[in-house]
Amino acid sequence: ALTESIVARSQGNYASVQNIADDVKAKLGGGTIGVIFPILSRNRFAICLKGIAMGAKKVVLMLSYPSDEVGNALLTYDQLDEAGINPYTDVLTLEKYRELFGENKHEFTGVDYVEYYSNIIKEAGAEVEVIFANQPKTILDYTDCIINCDIHTRARTKRILLAGGAKVVCGMDDILNASVNGGGCNEKYGLLGSNKSTEDQIKLFPN
């Protein structure tokens, strides 16, 4: 079977991080943007985050815990139990997270995703604030312009945020769902299903 990447390559469905930045700025205003529930992935999400941060003045990065949607763990439930933390209700600041859990490098890759994602945002020229929470509404205490990066729960997350008073909510499927400055796009999925191609280029899901 043809892999997605081969099909995408034959279609030339590529976009630049600058295309992402321009789309994010146009749709979310370029100020403080909440980026919530991303997966922890160097290949899939890191390059999207770079583009998003280039289109923002500040990024409030809200990570789900103890793991992301596809099971990449930041923490174990044992660690949460030991610290007396309830992931359903408790919101952790970066300071609190570090105080309780330290560095927490990823079990297989050795990457501290909290630090890694923070550095991507800073290097893209934006300020960063990191929080840990599992209720979508929490982000509304920080900003009303939000990109919800979850995949299977994205419609529900968007609904909760809009009902809670968010001004603008974009899913990953709403970014690059039309061409920006001649770059690639996917009308149905936008950035969903995309992969890093180079440091400054992303390979989108074939149309």
Where are these regions (language model features)?
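Conserved mixed alpha/beta catalytic, RNA-binding, or beta-rich assembly cores of soluble enzyme
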Residues: 5-207
